[in-house]
């Protein structure tokens, strides 16, 4: 696969290969930078692989690389210096009488214009090109676009071997075409297993010029014994015929374009024999063009290994004025191999998109257009319409002429992508002006429209948020109502239990209420009003913003019940422990009642049980009242949130009751200690009961244990240290 990729890229184009660099034969020269671009543009169009200018230095050194970052393809092009250095580096430059950097075909063109005035019947006048960009002279050039005049007898055609008659018929047609252009194709000996192809270009002979008609009649039979042109060999080319046909097609394509321009005819005129022309040389040239087109259609088919695309790029429409830097230029280093197959390259549409910026810059002078629009529109390009420019600028015409596209190829998607490239180019221009501080951003009409649109969007958002906030508010309010109803029912039950506990419990509850008032004032931390909208003015707060504030406050109120304080958690644990103790006492009570029918024992146990139960009920009553009071404080808090002056009052109360709150925590710890003492009493009672069960045959021990338990319940100071939990000792 790698071998196929290497050959496919290296030998697809007769110039872009290893032999392009300076070597033993002196390499190839390009008179201008535009001549090099003609070659590289054709190469990248055939391969659909964009070649980018990676670096340049003072218009002397240029680095070209593949558009893929990891691809090793690279060409280094450098300025070759003056004419003296050029003569020493090229063996064929000794006979070159043209000034440095001036193509040979331009010199011939100037001489031929004088001959055209003298002899209008010369059929070779149609071969003169009017576009000097198409042709360039290189030393030892295999694939070139030279237009030499057939009357110039200095152009001698040479052959390495005298076996011209041994070529097949297909090669004969191609050789005839090249001989008319001053170029011939040579083959090595037939004994080689791999044929070698080379193309020599005729040079000026020292002998004097002869008549043009003699040169035209005996053009194909002249042979020069002196070999003054060195050739390039391609040892890896599989088939000479494929390379020859590809080169013949390229030259024929350029010739047909040049003749059409010169005669003022369309491209299709070359496919018809001009029967009305009295000049036989013109007929001969037209027939040659027909043969070239036929050979080209065969050579560029999809099955031919020497060509990739069915169409060649039209170099006539290139505007290389900016690239026409005088040379000569030579390739100092080349790495023609790619690391990716041709199938992975770009499609024609994507390839064209990569060329849009350069066409805008060089061909359409888009920078000048933007600058003109910028100056005429008060330092802005807002009036510049990209869609109108795509249709009216002639960009599509350039793409159709250069890359062989038709109007049907420009689909809507491709046009939008082209417009996007132009928009990107325009955006870079605007960014450059903004960095310079020259761009005018003030656009009242557009800004007012944007403000109106933003207001509409905000109003729609507010409407949606209002509906959502209202639904959430309804859910939260309903949930709060149901929870408050349940709490009120529980509080009513607890109040009825409190009435049965006596005056002592009422005093304790009153004390607990005062404590809870201080606790709620300490626990309440007034929040700042949230910033509703940092872009809104104070008088532009919407209804949704107010509803969000209410929603946050309601959520905060609900979180108080969801996340109780540490004192409430401790009280809940103590309540659960007391309930377990009561259940155990009841079970022990039933077991004792079944075994002992003594009324005295039952009465004593009932006294203990009632005392414990009353203590637990009083604790539950205190906790329920605390919960009820906390609910009341939550309601008051919601009201306080709406009144800032009451919030300030709460802050003052908080600072004044700080010390009382600290005392409150100490009192809560004492209450927890009392509960733990009750649990100790229960554990002592359990031990005595177990002892009684083990010695049920001795009832007098039970009476003593019960009496001792009653005495300990009445007087807690008589408890020994062993029966007190370690954390409560010494208190």
Swiss-Prot record:
Residues 624-628 are annotated as: C-terminal sequence 1. Residues 639-662 are annotated as: C-terminal sequence 2. Residues 149-161, 634-643 have a biased composition (Basic and acidic residues). The modification Phosphoserine is found at residues 193, 467, 554, 618, 624, 720. InterPro entries: BAF1_ABF1. GO terms for biological process: chromatin remodeling; DNA-templated DNA replication; global genome nucleotide-excision repair; negative regulation of transcription by RNA polymerase II; positive regulation of transcription by RNA polymerase II; silent mating-type cassette heterochromatin formation. General regulatory factor (GRF) that contributes to transcriptional activation of a large number of genes, as well as to DNA replication, silencing and telomere structure. Involved in the transcription activation of a subset of ribosomal protein genes. Binds the ARS-elements found in many promoters. Binds to the sequence 5'-TCN(7)ACG-3'. Influences on genome-wide nucleosome occupancy and affects chromatin structure, and probably dynamics. Present with 4820 molecules/cell in log phase SD medium. This is ARS-binding factor 1. The lineage of its organism: Eukaryota, Fungi, Dikarya, Ascomycota, Saccharomycotina.
